[in-house]
Amino acid sequence: MKEDLRTIRISDLTLPELRGMSTAEPPGMRQQPMLILPNSFTFSYKAENFTACQHDILILIFEKLQGFMTTGCPLDKELCSEQKVTIDCSEIMDIRHKEHVIQAALGLRDLQFGFRYIRDELGNVNRVWGVFVTTVEDIRDTSFIRLTINRDIFPVLTYYGESVGGTFLLKGPALETKGRHTKTIRNMLISRKGIGQFQVELDEFKRMLGLSPQYRPSCLRKDILEPVRRWLLENSDIWFEYELIREKVPGRRARSNAIFIWIYSRDKDGKKKPS
């Protein structure tokens, strides 16, 4: 388990108080139901290693947790018993492929999480490690499965307040996006839409996409960046343009060491505009 754990503050906020809180939405988006994915979760994992089906399972899990979301103090993990979440597999794929969804859900039992929390006013910090999904239950003769979520991860799943932002997603487009790399890159774009552009080291970008450091930039462009860019341009309300930044090394060929991405979206009339 990596030591670069997130640090959040645990308070004595009770479960009834948390259930009564409303889910915040970004300005201008009041007419559409939003899902909030706290960045403490989405940026703490190699989400790019999830299959497309596992991406969709996580979307449906977060939909069930929206009533617990807070920009204030996180839920006291001692007050919440293990949380069971029921999801409809037919929202992900045809019911004939329910077994495929079950296998993807079983894979989430291997998803490890870790974070630090400040336990008192003196700033003393505890560290927590664990698994995300503990059990998967097949509700036979239906399209539903029931997942048990480890209660100790609730602070990470429900808090998007100070120092921890949140990525706002529309459920429909998130589920309709095809392919794990497309889903991962689309989430990157949405989480950074407010700044309109960003640059990241190429090795880090490869890690975010679940690729080895040896993955060639030419293959990255041909097999991932271009297909994803075209799919988003044709099918999504948000897409990107990019440039691979080449570093000149004396006595050697210039090599790509970073990627710069410009984020674009469509306004309500479908016109292209920079984000």
Predicted segments with their positions:
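Charged, alpha-helix-forming regions
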Residues: 2-275
